[in-house]
């Protein structure tokens, strides 16, 4: 069924068609090769914005550092990072004045979180800079490696499992004169294969101990690894993003917890809520401004854009904010929270992989690692790269660049939002003391500013005052990229507001289609996406019906499961036709077995197996839902699974879908080739880790799973749990006396082994 897309717009008001202009169909652009150039750009730009600051040298690492705080007041419209401490503190004080008790209450909430958070919180997240191996690893592996190294260096606070104790270890590790770490390396040998008699390269993985002195350790602990941000639509140039190591992550987490708690209490904050909740919050602010301006005032809205938000923020400013927010709190709490900004003031940016050179004539390729950029002859580089390297050279230490000012992307989203909101808060009439006043919305670096005044001059004066106030705290509103409109039409975080929010449907386009997990999950995810868009994004019934038909078509082509009576020939046609002929009730066959599609927009909430269950032949039911079916390696099935769907911008979001276990819920086996590489040791660690976690979850089914509080290890928790369960089972007669005795004996043996270790 092919559709003429113009039909979709016959009755659509112009503003609703905005979404069709978004660059969201097709594959997004990915980066290839090295991110070194983008990282150097970031470092150089950041220093340029703060160039009139004071230079100092870090006494521990010898890194040159630039401090722009309380620098010269701006004389032009160029972006700059010269925030004034007293202005930031005053903005905080006014924010507290208009929200009595907000900081106090958020501190109390955060203190509770700090005392309860387990160290496993750090296993969330994907790639993390692993300082022991000097490259990126999955978060869980990087954490395990860090704890292992700490343990072998006599730091044991983390064994209690509380994050705060792990952070104590981090602090102690920075005072040590040297640290001993285990690194992985590869040995290659040429050996003759017995079967084929050919020479093959055999790789073995060695682990070797290495000592790192205090300076090198500090550099690694303060390093952010950089990568190129992938899949960014609507941009010609790529940019660099940072991934911090385990030493920094825990501290950042607590600061962001505090800031999140504050943002939740601020009506102008677009974080941490999302989706419909966010729209409601924003609509409230707009309503407030429009209601007040109906009779006598004009009201205008700026769809705002800030120039290089991260690169003009400054960790020293965040330190000042935290010092103010936590004033009257216990000393230990203030210390824990001030460490993250202090570490960021001394951060180092790792330049990534370096450059790849190839000589066309000699067919040679060679990698110039970042470590060599400090000393290599610049004649090999083109002009723009040469300029970058010359500029960055004074900042280089061991292949990392000292980067004191600036924040790197996505590290303190919540805290920087608090700073932005504190400026919006100053727009109340009691602070402006004139006829104009403003309010607005802030979400990380994105903002919308609503200004009310009796006449146009007042509006202009209000905007100017806002612009200058922002400059004082290191926020640079871009005059080129911001635009102003009568209130009622603006854009904020890709939500388009036109007397109410317009559904920007194109943002959801990338999540339509077949996910490629397996036949069962893909069908379920596909219909759930359509259902969710009917609920949240104005996907009308006719379009939804069409989306469904296109999805089924796509699904059948992906899994080659066209209807049993179709003319289309594929590899699976023979089996599917045979099944079709043998089946009495053809309507009961799943689409993935060549059956008809019974979905329409009224029954999208029902999993396909349930929808067709009554229509299935009995022997088909028996084959389909048989856990003993030898051809399927099953996942353990929960009633609800999570799929990762890709909206057009923002992080991949998790979406729940119903999971009914059938023989179509297979999981592909892992690629074996990893076993011959340097990753093998890591893979084994990861599997070990996985096994321990699975075992732990067997002991604590999710219903009774309370994170153990207090100082017990996983093993102790499991042993005590086993004893309690065994006693209950024995007393209720579910197990015999001998079984009970055996369980008790095993528990004692485990405890004995732990004591001997």
UniProtKB/Swiss-Prot annotation:
Recorded GO MF terms: nucleotide binding; RNA binding; RNA-directed RNA polymerase activity
GO cellular component terms, semicolon-separated: host cell cytoplasm; host cell nucleus
Bias-annotated ranges (Polar residues): 55-64
Top-level taxonomic group: Viruses
Gene3D superfamilies named among the record's database cross-references: 6.10.140.720
Keyword DNA-binding carried by entry: no
EC numbers, comma separated: 2.7.7.48
Modification after translation (UniProt): Phosphorylated by host PRKCA.
Alphabetical keyword list: Eukaryotic host gene expression shutoff by virus, Eukaryotic host transcription shutoff by virus, Host cytoplasm, Host gene expression shutoff by virus, Host nucleus, Host-virus interaction, Inhibition of host RNA polymerase II by virus, Nucleotide-binding, Nucleotidyltransferase, Phosphoprotein, RNA-directed RNA polymerase, Transferase, Viral RNA replication, Viral transcription
Motif Nuclear localization signal boundaries: 187-195, 203-216
Catalytic activity: RNA(n) + a ribonucleoside 5'-triphosphate = RNA(n+1) + diphosphate
Annotated localization: Host nucleus; Host cytoplasm
Classification via InterPro entries: RNA-dir_pol_NSvirus (IPR007099), RNA_pol_PB1_influenza (IPR001407)
Protein name: RNA-directed RNA polymerase catalytic subunit
Gene: PB1
